[in-house]
């Protein structure tokens, strides 16, 4: 792998400065963190499945996952306060760039009928979120080891407040956005 962090520092920053007309290099947008999260849904009651979900995203991220707990009880969903409801991993620095490179080069091309990720995942504050329907697109996940097939949300947090600047950053990093029709 060619080193996405070096690619960002050597090429992407120069292109961003030119295209966005930013003179101060400290104001250039950068990727701050990537959060991978999974909601367990109906499987939240089964602790073995929760452990398996946490183990799966730990394998994918290369870092230990944290099991998330409900902050409030919700009777409609049969959830009690403190009950395990999902798992998440927050990646920064080297692990973040390694994961992003693996996602772009290996995993996303393995998605069936892949035509690019949606451009609609920006939140208005420069962060981008998209979902993956199945964890099997990652090479670390072995089919026989998973108990439940689940998807995941991937959120990329950038240092900018502008969706336009964040889009340009992610596009230059190589994220395959869907073509506009």
Swiss-Prot record:
PROSITE patterns: RIBOSOMAL_L5. The keyword Transmembrane does not apply. Part of the 50S ribosomal subunit; part of the 5S rRNA/L5/L18/L25 subcomplex. Contacts the 5S rRNA and the P site tRNA. Forms a bridge to the 30S subunit in the 70S ribosome. This is one of the proteins that bind and probably mediate the attachment of the 5S RNA into the large ribosomal subunit, where it forms part of the central protuberance. In the 70S ribosome it contacts protein S13 of the 30S subunit (bridge B1b), connecting the 2 subunits; this bridge is implicated in subunit movement. Contacts the P site tRNA; the 5S rRNA and some of its associated proteins might help stabilize positioning of ribosome-bound tRNAs. One of its GO terms (cellular component) is ribonucleoprotein complex. Coiled coil: none annotated. The gene is rplE. SUPFAM superfamilies: RL5-like (SSF55282). Pfam families: Ribosomal_L5, Ribosomal_L5_C. Belongs to the universal ribosomal protein uL5 family. GO terms for biological process: translation. This is Large ribosomal subunit protein uL5. Keywords: Ribonucleoprotein, Ribosomal protein, RNA-binding, rRNA-binding, tRNA-binding.
């Amino acid at each position: 792998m060619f080193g996405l962090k070096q690619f960002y520092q050597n090429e992407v920053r120069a292109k961003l400065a030119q295209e966005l007309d930013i003179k101060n290099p400290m104001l250039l947008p950068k990727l701050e963190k990537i959060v991978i999260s999974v909601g367990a849904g109906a499987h939240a009651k089964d602790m073995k499945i929760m452990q398996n979900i946490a183990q799966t995203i730990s394998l994918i991220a290369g870092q230990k996952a944290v099991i998330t707990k409900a902050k409030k009880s919700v009777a409609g969903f049969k959830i009690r306060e403190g009950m395990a409801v999902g798992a998440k991993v927050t990646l920064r620095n080297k692990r973040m760039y390694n994961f992003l490179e693996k996602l772009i080069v290996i995993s996303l091309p393995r998605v069936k009928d892949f035509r690019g990720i949606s451009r609609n995942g920006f939140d208005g504050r420069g962060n981008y979120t998209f979902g993956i329907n199945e964890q099997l697109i990652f090479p670390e996940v072995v089919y026989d080891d998973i108990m439940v097939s689940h998807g995941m949300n991937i959120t990329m947090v950038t240092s900018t407040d502008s969706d336009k600047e964040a889009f340009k950053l992610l596009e230059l990093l190589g994220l395959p956005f869907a073509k506009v029709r």
